[in-house]
């Protein structure tokens, strides 16, 4: 019950911030071209992108700091990687609180499709399982460092149907593809591999094996979803780069 109240309180704070951002961006969005997608012209769509960027910056910064700390540990510290980490405990609460608020409000405003609903639910479940064990610091860091890619993504999602040919929209798309590959595919896949491969030998004694297997299955499912998206994102970024290269050649001619 205490954990549910904790998540609920953070989700409530994020929900208020989410809605407040929608009101604060009115002067800026009113000067933007309209989106070709009707639901994106709802001011709360822009507010969600601002709130999501704040979450990505806060959670990503904390998680990347934790990853650096793990990377600079002496070799043979696998047991430490499966223990808790104070930074990740706080980042996990921030992250899960936002995911809950974003899921509820996103459904309410009709911003989420089926794939993103599954994505949110998987992340909430994984973080809840990890927090219930009070451990898995490295795993939590690899998961939450993926939020770094949300910074260029949120700008791209805001502008892709408003000014698709603007240089900043294209730059954000390519930057997101690079960040997605680095944090969500490379770092995220390593985190899943590390947990699945080493959990049998380094799982804390007080954690039930069934719970660890459930967490491992959730990680694999989330990772498969990331790779599915990664192929699509990579193709889109390649098209942007080819179009840019073709335009440069045409100007030179």
Could you describe each region identified by the protein language model?
Residues 1-145, 157-253:
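Membrane-helix and juxtamembrane interface regions of eukaryotic multi-pass membrane proteins
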Residues 144-152:
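Generic alpha-helical transmembrane segments
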């Amino acid at each position: 019950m205490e954990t549910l109240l904790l998540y609920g309180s953070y989700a409530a704070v994020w929900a208020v911030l989410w809605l407040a951002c929608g009101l604060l961006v009115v002067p800026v969005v009113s000067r933007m071209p309209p989106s070709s997608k009707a639901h994106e012209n709802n001011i709360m769509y822009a507010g969600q992108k601002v709130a999501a960027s704040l979450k990505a910056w806060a959670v990503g910064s904390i998680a990347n700091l934790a990853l650096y700390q793990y990377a600079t540990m002496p070799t043979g510290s696998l047991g430490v990687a499966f223990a808790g980490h104070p930074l990740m405990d706080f980042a996990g609460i921030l992250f899960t609180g936002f995911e809950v608020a974003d899921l509820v409000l996103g459904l309410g405003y009709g911003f989420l499709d089926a794939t993103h609903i599954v994505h949110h639910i998987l992340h909430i479940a994984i973080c809840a399982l990890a927090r219930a064990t009070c451990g898995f610091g490295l795993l939590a860091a690899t998961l939450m460092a993926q939020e770094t890619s949300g910074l260029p993504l949120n700008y791209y999602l805001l502008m892709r149907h408003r000014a698709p040919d603007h240089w900043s929209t294209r730059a954000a798309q390519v930057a997101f593809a690079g960040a997605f590959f680095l944090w969500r595919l490379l770092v995220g896949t390593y985190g899943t591999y590390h947990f699945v491969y080493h959990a049998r030998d380094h799982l804390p004694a007080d954690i039930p094996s069934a719970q660890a297997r459930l967490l491992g299955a959730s990680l694999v499912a989330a990772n498969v979803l990331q790779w599915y998206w990664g192929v699509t994102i990579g193709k889109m970024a390649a098209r942007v780069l080819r179009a840019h290269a073709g335009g440069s050649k045409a100007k030179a001619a």
